[in-house]
A protein has these predicted regions:
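Short acidic, Pro/Gly- and aromatic-enriched capping/linker segments at domain boundaries
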Residues: 2-20
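Short, surface-exposed, charged amphipathic helix/loop patches that serve as local interaction elements
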Residues: 3, 14, 24, 31-136
Length: 136
């Protein structure tokens, strides 16, 4: 039995768009199902953690003693660390989607400057415009 050799390109399964953002070209990759699932999970975790932090903030204001407030503040710091880790994971997903053609530092700087919500808006705008251009 002979072993046949095959070569396959995945480019037809992955959508990318060249986008000029603030004077620099990026190749932006559309999220696949796995990336969408990761993003959805992280956004859900972020919203849950945000709710917990807001609830804890209210409890701290109602604390009866300084010791009680200090304990809650310490718990709050741990939750803030968790919140920041989730934000970092979401940003990492976006950084991976925005290829700056270099070492990724420009992509990271862009994502950090925009924040998650505005990065999502830019991402959506890129693919909305690409879809409109394809129809024309």
């Amino acid at each position: 039995m002979s072993l046949e050799s095959v070569s396959i390109s995945t480019s037809k399964y992955i959508t990318t768009v060249k986008a000029n953002i603030d004077g620099h070209d990026y190749i932006v990759r559309k999220m696949g199902a796995g990336t969408q699932l990761d993003m959805s999970r992280e956004i859900s975790n972020l919203m849950k953690m945000r709710t917990e932090l807001l609830n804890l903030e209210g409890k701290i204001k109602k604390a009866k003693t300084d010791e009680e407030a200090d304990k809650m503040l310490a718990d709050n710091m741990g939750k803030m660390e968790s919140f920041n880790k989730i934000v970092n994971r979401i940003e990492a997903i976006f950084i991976d989607l925005f290829d700056d053609g270099e070492d990724g530092k420009r992509s990271a700087k862009l994502i950090h400057a925009l924040g998650i919500e505005n990065t999502q808006k830019v991402y959506n705008e890129i693919f909305d415009k690409a879809e409109q251009n394809a129809k024309e």
